[in-house]
Amino acid sequence: MAATLGKTIVATGASSGLGFESVKQLLQQSQPYKFIIGARDLKTTQAAFDQVQYDAKTHSVSILPLDLADLRTVKPFAQQTLEALDQDKLDILFLNAGMNKAATGPGLHGSKWCEAYVVNHLSQHYLTQLLRPKLSASHSRVVVVSSGLIRAVKEADIEAFETTLKADSGADGFKVYHASKFVQFLGAHWWRRQLGTSATVLAVSPGLVIGTGLGRHLDTQPNLDHIPDKVTVDKGAKSLLRAFDCNDIPEDPEQIFLTSWGEWWPKDVYSLSLDKSLQDRWCPSQEDIEA
């Protein structure tokens, strides 16, 4: 089968919120895109995209089953994705899925980890492992949706991650979100090291976005009315899309964080994440994940 013209994007967390809006904005462009989207609720996600006005002769949207809270669904999704790609390049791996939820109750599907950690980091790290050969062969760009909250993490917090991120640790949603997003950022560094020059890995913040549904699992919803820098979903998506094709990437391989206002954070902002042994600790091998 001949390769598809245009860019091919594999996306997580694109059934609603920022991910959905990002895909929607790209579907309005004249450049062809082929999307492969992982979603837990196929029917609802398909219905949402059916409402988007786009040229189906120019773009394609395929929705495949993926429940990031269940590691067992990741490998079948990766296999179906590779089959769907066939000879096409994987131009962009868009890792957008995220949740804000307290670590209460037992881990899902027998996991020792809380659901938010599995969704925010472990499952998407595993997916990247499974797609690694294709990423290298395609010279892909891996776009990790991060958060400016990573700079609030302290050394004492990192030392407590093993406890905080365990299932039923009792840690509240905000503590779990800070920890899991920091670990996710460690993963971005780790993948930048592992993939080297064969692929590009970036982390990008959408800013403080309102109306995404990220905090729907929280018992108490934060009041953002007093925060002047909050942004809408469409503006947050524009910030994310900047990472898809920006060409001003710093030469320093550790300077990978693109802010919502389009600047690259200096490394001293996130110096704690530069510890390679810490990156290794939180980025298990495919074999360890499957054990």
From Swiss-Prot:
| Transmembrane portions of the chain | none
Query: Does the record bear Oxidoreductase in its keywords?
Result: yes
In terms of Pfam families, this protein maps to:
adh_short
> SUPFAM superfamilies from the xrefs?
NAD(P)-binding Rossmann-fold domains
- What EC number(s) would the UniProt record show? 1.1.1.-
Q: Which UniProt keywords apply?
A: NADP, Oxidoreductase
Known pathway: Secondary metabolite biosynthesis
Instruction: Name the positions where NADP(+) binds.
Output: L18, D67, N96, Y177, K181, V209
One GO term in the molecular function aspect is: oxidoreductase activity
The positions flagged as active site in the entry are: Y177 (proton acceptor), K181 (lowers pka of active site tyr)
Q: What induces it?
A: The expression of the dibenzodioxocinones biosynthesis cluster is positively regulated by the transcription factor dibT.
By sequence similarity, the record places it as follows: Belongs to the short-chain dehydrogenases/reductases (SDR) family.
Give a short account of what the protein does: Short-chain dehydrogenase/reductase; part of the gene cluster that mediates the biosynthesis of dibenzodioxocinones such as pestalotiollide B, a novel class of inhibitors against cholesterol ester transfer protein (CEPT). The biosynthesis initiates from condensation of acetate and malonate units catalyzed by the non-reducing PKS pks8/GME11356. Pks8/GME11356 lacks a thioesterase (TE) domain, which is important to the cyclizing of the third ring of atrochrysone carboxylic acid, and the esterase GME11355 might play the role of TE and catalyzes the cyclization reaction of the C ring.
Q: What is this protein called?
A: Short-chain dehydrogenase/reductase GME11359
User: Which organism is the protein's source?
Assistant: Pestalotiopsis microspora
